[in-house]
């Protein structure tokens, strides 16, 4: 809900209930706006979202209306099981895409397609990626654990960072540089870069590359 200061100016947006935004049917076309911003406890995407710049911010949060700063708060009601759930028939198509999961422990699950010029994904829970995600420019992804059984590709640079493990069972690729940082990396299929490839692990356990 929107909150206002004592001069009745929009101050911030407070998301503390258990509501979920559901995108279904013919999807959501935000191309007439410069920026499409979705603030919700959780998002379920069963159809396509189109836009120029798309922000999806989930979790129990207060979002500053002027700066966009996201501050986690205590949520009410039933805690969702998934922060952002992109179904098989769901997808996002935009110049710039920002997917922010700010509630600890909630995963992002991507089974559909995401196409962008520039993409940022930052989640406080795990990322389960079984779909196809492609960025024409830079792609930056951070999550607790990352499990890829789909295709993640960047036509420029890619940065993958996990607080725990990165497990790849299909394809992760970039035309530009790729930097991977995790406690442990397990690769069963293809991790490839046409330029520099850097893999940094912090665990003393053996990594399977």
Locate predicted features:
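Extracellular and secretory-pathway beta-repeat/beta-biased strand scaffolds
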Residues: 1-209
């Amino acid at each position: 809900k929107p909150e206002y200061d004592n001069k009745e100016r929009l101050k911030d947006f407070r998301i503390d209930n258990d509501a979920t935004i559901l995108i279904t049917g013919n999807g959501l076309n935000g191309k007439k706006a410069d920026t499409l911003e979705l603030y919700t406890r959780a998002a379920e995407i069963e159809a396509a979202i189109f836009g120029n710049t798309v922000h999806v911010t989930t979790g129990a949060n207060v979002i500053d209306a002027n700066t966009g700063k996201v501050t986690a708060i205590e949520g009410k009601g039933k805690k969702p099981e998934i922060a952002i759930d992109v179904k098989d028939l769901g997808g996002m198509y935009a110049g710039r895409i920002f997917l922010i999961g700010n509630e600890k422990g909630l995963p992002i699950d991507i089974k559909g397609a995401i196409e962008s010029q520039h993409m940022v994904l930052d989640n406080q829970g795990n990322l389960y990626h079984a779909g196809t995600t492609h960025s024409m420019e830079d792609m930056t992804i951070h999550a607790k654990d990352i499990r890829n059984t789909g295709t993640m590709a960047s036509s420029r640079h890619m940065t993958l960072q996990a607080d725990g493990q990165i497990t790849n069972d299909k394809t992760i690729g970039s035309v530009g540089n790729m930097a991977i940082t995790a406690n442990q990396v397990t690769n069963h299929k293809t991790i490839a870069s046409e330029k520099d490839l850097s893999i940094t692990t912090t665990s003393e356990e053996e990594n399977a590359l």
